[in-house]
UniProtKB/Swiss-Prot annotation:
Gene giving rise to this polypeptide: rplX
GO BP, one annotated term: translation
Gene Ontology terms for molecular function: rRNA binding; structural constituent of ribosome
Keyword Ribosomal protein: yes
A matching Pfam family: ribosomal_L24
Subunit structure: Part of the 50S ribosomal subunit.
GO cellular component: ribonucleoprotein complex; ribosome
Family indicated by similarity: Belongs to the universal ribosomal protein uL24 family.
Organism ancestry: Bacteria, Bacillati, Bacillota, Clostridia, Eubacteriales
NCBIfam families linked: rplX_bact
HAMAP family to which the protein is assigned, alphabetical: Ribosomal_uL24_B
InterPro entries membership: KOW, Rib_uL2_dom2, Ribosomal_uL24, Ribosomal_uL24_KOW, Translation_prot_SH3-like_sf
Keyword Ribonucleoprotein: yes
Protein name, entry field: Large ribosomal subunit protein uL24
Alphabetically ordered keywords of this record: Ribonucleoprotein, Ribosomal protein, RNA-binding, rRNA-binding
Length: 105
């Protein structure tokens, strides 16, 4: 239950596991579990039984959560995975900054 370093709609790159080097958008963050769900990463096959909402049933594909330690923020300017630092601007707002190039997120 550590603090998650990425937020919803951030672009991230997977740094380990079967989907290593895939780039995707964070769909949701699960802070109590320390996991994130990334678009088109860790896609699992689920056999859905027919029920009232889904009368057809069948096989569906959906993204499963992965640990947040396996993803890094992706900087569009650097075109690579990067660490971030927090910076306070003159007007008092706190922004996230790329450690490599200084670009704000």
């Amino acid at each position: 239950m550590s603090k998650i370093h990425v937020r919803k709609k951030d672009t991230v790159v997977v740094i380990s596991g079967k989907d290593k080097s895939k780039i995707g958008e964070v769909l949701s963050v699960l802070p109590k579990k320390g996991k994130v769900i990334v678009k088109d990463v860790n896609v699992v096959t689920k056999h859905q039984k027919p029920n009232r909402e889904n009368m057809q049933g069948g096989i569906i594909h959906k993204e499963a959560p992965i640990f947040s330690s396996k993803v890094m923020l992706y900087c569009d300017k650097c075109k690579s995975a990067t660490r971030i630092s927090n910076k306070i601007l003159e007007d008092g707002t706190k922004v996230r900054v790329c450690k490599k190039c200084g670009e704000t997120f």
